[in-house]
Amino acid sequence: ARTEGLVNPRPAELFFGRYLLFFVLSQLQAAIIVTGDLYLLKVQCLHPGAMYLTASLTAFTFSLLIYSMALSFGDVGKALVVVIMVMQIAGSSGTFPIELLPEIYQKIYRFFPFPYAIDAMRECICGMYGSYYGQQLAFLLLFAAAALLIGLLVRRPFMGLNHFMEEKLEETELL
């Protein structure tokens, strides 16, 4: 990261300073998507305010997770994010009930944030059932906390390895 003109920036300040752009873009995207769902597609939603909140928290969690993985693990982190995304789309109970999916997805789907976001959105659209909505948001916040740990703590030990991997990748002239 370029740090000219900055007086002794701490790693956390650099992390959040760079993440701010991704945060703003993800929040704008979430607001545009929910507005389009509600007013263009006319999705019947019992709790539109909660839908905006859920989309905002989901965008925050996913953008932070992607940013942390890419920053901490470099190209390997980017590849991991793609694998996680594909596995979540295939096995998150968003397209079919989880009980109808292959057994591997039934075992791993709760270890990804996507099912919690989907369940929270369902609560917003169909109606709230007890504290289930709050539980789903709490799980999303746990994934955001894990992403922060990856981005702020795990990154430092991998900096040398990432630099080595990038040099070797440049030597291959594949990218």
Language-model segment annotations:
Residues A1-L175:
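Membrane-spanning alpha-helical segments of multipass transporters and channels
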